[in-house]
């Protein structure tokens, strides 16, 4: 039997008409335990369905060390049919009550051990398409909070510059890396805009195209990602985490499969793999 807990919406930041950051605080004041990369299922009674609770899972953008609230970034997809729950969420306001079920999910858990039991010290590359960035915002804040020394790169793809939902937070984390030194905190954040020709994106001077174009080799044989880190990506030195629509997952694997990278679903006989992913469509 599903047990719904109750929480109150304490913060709403409307980034644009169809993109919002929302914070929830459980009514008992106790933020549930969870791991970076997990999702939480929330719900609201739908008045058009006899107040039946309509639920949906969302990746958590806040990090486990934050015991004040759960933060989500939510897209309102209105075509071809508006989402039943997201439509209600975009009409919700601070003070409204919402149901939730404890966080779960292991698809994007941070890999800490190699198959032989040794510590996984590979470079971490996180690729998020749209709101698929959320688990990696949690990753970045968590790894920063615990003082992880691994090299971490977060790549975000969006259609428009105002959809770079955590640009300021992630840029600040990169500045902290520059200030403290890479031996203490080694972090980079880069974004790509897929519609640079649109008037609204006229000021954008960064990477263009879908987020997986960071992996496409250029004339010299290095990809934009490899140029950023100053190193060649190999199976031994890098693990990828990917979240977004299935097209994003497929796009990443189109570049990585020819290089011998395999996913956790197709791991080798010895248990090794280089790509973990979660698709939400």
Task: List PLM regions with ranges.
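Reductase modules of NAD(P)H-dependent flavoproteins
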Residues: 3, 155, 160-281
């Amino acid at each position: 039997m599903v047990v719904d807990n109750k929480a109150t919406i304490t913060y709403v930041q409307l980034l644009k008409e169809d993109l919002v950051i929302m914070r929830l605080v459980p009514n008992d004041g106790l933020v549930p335990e969870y791991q970076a990369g997990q999702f939480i299922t929330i719900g609201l009674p739908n008045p058009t369905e006899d107040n039946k609770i309509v639920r949906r899972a969302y990746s958590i953008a806040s990090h486990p060390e934050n015991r004040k609230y759960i933060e989500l970034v939510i897209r309102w997809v209105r075509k071809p049919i508006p989402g039943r729950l997201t439509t209600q969420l975009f009409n919700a306001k601070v003070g409204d009550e919402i149901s939730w079920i404890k966080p779960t999910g292991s698809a994007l858990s941070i890999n800490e051990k190699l198959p032989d039991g040794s510590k996984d010290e590979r470079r971490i590359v996180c690729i998020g398409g749209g709101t698929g960035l959320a688990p990696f915002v949690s990753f970045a804040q968590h790894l920063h909070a615990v003082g992880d020394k691994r090299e971490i790169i977060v790549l975000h793809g969006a259609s428009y510059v105002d959809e770079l939902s955590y640009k300021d937070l992630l840029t600040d984390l990169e500045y902290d890396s520059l200030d403290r030194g890479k031996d203490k905190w080694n972090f980079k954040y880069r974004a790509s805009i897929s519609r640079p020709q649109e008037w609204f994106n006229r000021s954008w001077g960064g990477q263009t195209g879908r987020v997986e174009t960071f992996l496409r080799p250029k004339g010299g044989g290095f990809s934009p990602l490899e140029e950023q880190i100053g190193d060649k990506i190999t199976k031994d030195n890098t693990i990828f985490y990917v979240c977004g629509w299935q097209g994003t997952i497929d796009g990443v694997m189109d570049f990585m499969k020819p290089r011998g990278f395999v996913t956790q679903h197709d791991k080798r006989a010895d248990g090794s793999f280089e790509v973990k992913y979660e698709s939400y469509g």
